[in-house]
Amino acid sequence: IKDDTARFEHMDWRNIVYLVGYYKEGRIIPAAPPILTTEMAKHTISARPNMQKKNKMRLERKYTEAPIIIFLRDLLLDGRFQGSNSPDFKNTIDMHVITQRPPGSYLTVKLDTVYKFRYVRFLARDGIRSDISEVEFYSPSDSVNPLKGIPMGNPPVDGDNSHRMEMAFDGDPLTCYASANLNNAWVGLDFGKKTEINKIRFAPRGDDNSVREGDEYELKYLSMDGWVSLGRQTARTYFLEFSGGPDKALYLLSNLTRGREERPFTYENDTQVWW
């Protein structure tokens, strides 16, 4: 420190967020806005909250999404949720077809028709293994608890029991089913009798860092006095909506129910930009 200026040398410049601060009464107080360093010629980006302009934000994740996670979501495209009253799935009916990249967390699909089947399944498109984390079917009489049945489908990839068909119905989004087949790859349930179905809920294979329905979250932004809370919300679907956050601020979304991974971000052009 010299002439009221602090100089830091031998710093790593590879996409790292730095915050210069000082201790006061047991807290770290920012001495300057946070800085993101990039690999491009030691370029820096600073986050300075603009309190005169407020954002309405739609948030889907609390941590950056790796390319493999996006790839796993895309594996479900053109997948079909089918029903039949024959164990070999003759005369199947498509209850739902995945036509858009699904979110990283659970997606609920309310069916236009009440179907009645004994056998149901998720069938991946040809040439793709049936990698999926969770599959749930619901009846009109119980919208909370998924229907129970005997798992059925292809054997797991490489005979790996950690990816066996039961994993698609265990209620844990961090486990998954992965089929050995690359064609006609599927996993399903035998209900034991014809059963009414009016809702499907499923989750792609992922890292559980997407917004999860039923979990409580808190959004904060970094001010010159430290982190400021914008409130808490319990997720009702795979995204959260917050209003009143200052433009150009550095944000942090925390899951108060489970998980520890989180990463700061700015909100630009209606998108979370990870730091």
Which sequence ranges carry the predicted segments?
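A glycine-anchored, Pro-Gly-centered beta-turn/N-cap motif
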Residues: 13-16, 249
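Acidic, serine/threonine- and glycine-rich low-complexity intrinsically disordered segments
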Residues: 4-6, 17-22
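Short, solvent-exposed S/T- and G/P-enriched segments that are highly enriched in secreted/extracellular
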Residues: 2-10, 234-239
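Aromatic, loop-rich ligand-recognition surfaces of beta-strand-rich domains
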Residues: 22-34, 39-92, 101-240, 244-275
